């Protein structure tokens, strides 16, 4: 590969990693498993080591991952919070320790390490002055983090005052905030019942819970913390041992991992690694590896730091959470819109600390593409806490009696015909609300927080109401009475009254929420908002044609067809009429006149990078108010790309396609003119 090719490869990796960092640390929405991120990062490091002429100051390898959010006040750390370098193999660990020994003044000594589990949470820095907690911050970019003082105080195990009579004048205590596995599962289960957002994994749950503008939300989440080190410390003599410093933190009142161990040399570290790897599934918290730190503080100081990490410590990462097992059967689940989803039933296997016996097969196109058959030995992956999926088949282990997976002709719940359109990957039950599975999912959607928000109407209660024939349609919910509800198992009069109150409260809504609650195929929150802004009431929407609907932002031919089909069904209109008769109502929105002469009217606009004057959602709202269509990707149909700082691949693609680029200053002039 020539220099130009190498440079392009490096730039591609840098752009990928920046994107991954932004989604992981800022949005708390990881795009790829940790193993894939680590591979990209390591590939970039290797390129830069081999071709140092292409190493640039803006490379992700030259900084600590993470960016302080605009939503929180910045806090500077007195001593930087650097990331750790990663090792993945025994040879890499040996090389790391060898480099450390060679840099020390007495290279022949046997190194002693403090070994700790690497918790998969959010790193924080807590500052105590005169023994009192004065402020707390996230790691951020290593030098400056986000002020989360009010939120960290909601964690009961964080001492507000150090439990010693002679505290340091100032001390920074570093720790990892996490959510225990059991609490995470319980939180997500309840969120699903209430129709609220669930978290992909405990790390995201901890980060999302701690980075809340409202501390009451943080207080409602099951956050915990283990402390792992000390940053700056003034007017206090600290022990010359990391392990002794951890004991000191315990005396101060902090929680320290009980799995911390002392190890000598490479063999001691590897023994600890194997010990924690074997124990990983039994731990009450998620870990993705172990951390080794040279125990002597004076040796740590001799070794110092490289640009983004200490030379005296590293993280030894565990393998990605994939396992082999046998696929023994396939069942089919029916969703709200009739989608029939194949689910693999597996011989139970432990993956990432959870026993997995089911995994999604997504759809029949995926089954065909991966050539998955009943009886196959398959690799399943559980990345974070997303639904486990079948990744691939071990073909050499395929038995002679492996069977093809066939699409059922009839719905496994109601017996109605299952059809699959030629251009769709998804097969559907045509039973509609006659199908109990669809009715249950429809009611769950109708009652969810972003729809009618009927608090207390969760999946367990919905199952009871449908299975016992108490409700047959959405409108039946608003005709429930106290006696019927109170007589249900585990309900009682108080719970029944609360549900009736929630039903009454939900009657006052908005037109866009009501439309979203109806569950029209292809119509999400954004589409419902567009329809509500344009039509204002059911009668005018019922009369809309496909051609007319397609002129609206975010409404394409498929969505338009589903809308017209929905309002052409007599039973849908009957349910809507009943809902309105039973008191569902909304204020009539004021018609906003859009100046059609503004440069954004009718244009497709893409936002990329970071705007210094407003957040992404605010910019999007301004564009929508001006009649623009805001898209998430650049194509030949894009009219403008609004580029903030650190704009990446979208800006590159826009330049390649010749799309007009608008800088922030120009954008502000246009939206404010």
Curated annotation (Swiss-Prot):
Active site: 118 (n6-amp-lysine intermediate)
Reactions the enzyme catalyzes: NAD(+) + (deoxyribonucleotide)n-3'-hydroxyl + 5'-phospho-(deoxyribonucleotide)m = (deoxyribonucleotide)n+m + AMP + beta-nicotinamide D-nucleotide
SUPFAM superfamilies per UniProt: BRCT domain, DNA ligase/mRNA capping enzyme, catalytic domain, Nucleic acid-binding proteins, RuvA domain 2-like
GO CC, any one term: cytosol
One annotated GO molecular function: metal ion binding
UniProt superkingdom: Bacteria
Binding site for NAD(+): 34-38, 83-84, 116, 139, 176, 293, 317
GO biological process: DNA repair; DNA replication
Enzyme class at the top of the EC tree: ligase
Pfam families: BRCT, DNA_ligase_aden, DNA_ligase_OB, DNA_ligase_ZBD, HHH_2, HHH_5, Nlig-Ia
EC number: 6.5.1.2
Function: DNA ligase that catalyzes the formation of phosphodiester linkages between 5'-phosphoryl and 3'-hydroxyl groups in double-stranded DNA using NAD as a coenzyme and as the energy source for the reaction. It is essential for DNA replication and repair of damaged DNA.
Family of this protein: Belongs to the NAD-dependent DNA ligase family. LigA subfamily.
Name of protein: DNA ligase
